[in-house]
Structures are given as C-alpha cells and as structure tokens.
C-alpha cells in the first residue's frame, strides 16, 4: 500500500512505516500530523488517481525530527573587479514517520 502526497509544494511517494523528509512543518517532535492532500492511492490491487486529490484518503504521520539540511554554499564573483560574495544556506526540514494510510477517512 502506498500513496503520493503533496506538501510544501512537492510530491512524495510514501508507504506505511517509511521515514520521509519533507519541507518544514509546524509542530514538535512526537506530534502527529494528518496529511489529506493525497494525489494517488494504491492498495496493491487498485489505483485511485485524484483530480486533483483523492477523496476520503488521508495519511497519518508522526514528527520524528525537526532539523536543517547540509549547508549549500553560494559564491558569486566578477572577474578582475575584486567583487566576491560568499553566502551559505541551510534548508529546514521535518522528518515524518508514516504510521497509517487511511482509505475511507
């Protein structure tokens, strides 16, 4: 059983018991999150594709980590002019453990 969910402007294929890193969601570690933007749902035999979302299907997940990704360095310069600019960015993320995919929720 798996589902394709939309959160943070991105789409993720998830199954029960998996840990998925998504864009930052509000909440503390241990909180439960209900994701109801399910774009596709498969129970092993049948596949339901939403237009745009599948009705009565939701994904229950638990927050296992709130963190920041590895640093990405952005370096800009203009040759022969002495212009150099170095900037770093760490994108915040939320790690979710998928507890249950509920059909008919």
Swiss-Prot record:
Keywords: Ribonucleoprotein, Ribosomal protein, RNA-binding, rRNA-binding. InterPro entries: bL21-like, bL21-like_sf, Ribosomal_bL21, Ribosomal_bL21_CS. GO terms for cellular component: cytoplasm; ribonucleoprotein complex; ribosome. One of its GO terms (biological process) is translation. GO terms for molecular function: rRNA binding; structural constituent of ribosome. Pfam families: Ribosomal_L21p (PF00829). The keyword Glycosyltransferase does not apply. This protein binds to 23S rRNA in the presence of protein L20. Belongs to the bacterial ribosomal protein bL21 family. HAMAP family: Ribosomal_bL21. Part of the 50S ribosomal subunit. Contacts protein L20. This is Large ribosomal subunit protein bL21. It comes from Desulfatibacillum aliphaticivorans. The lineage of its organism: Bacteria, Pseudomonadati, Thermodesulfobacteriota, Desulfobacteria, Desulfobacterales.
């Amino acid at each position: 059983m798996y589902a394709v969910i939309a959160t943070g402007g991105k789409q993720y294929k998830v199954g029960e018991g998996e840990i998925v890193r998504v864009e930052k969601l509000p909440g503390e570690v241990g909180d439960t999150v209900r994701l109801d933007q399910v774009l596709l749902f498969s129970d092993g035999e049948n596949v339901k594709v939403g237009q745009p979302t599948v009705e009565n299907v939701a994904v229950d997940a638990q927050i296992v980590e709130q963190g920041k990704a590895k640093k990405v360095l952005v370096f800009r310069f203009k040759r022969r002019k002495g212009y150099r600019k170095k900037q770093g960015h760490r994108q915040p993320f939320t790690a979710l453990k998928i507890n249950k995919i509920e059909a008919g929720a």
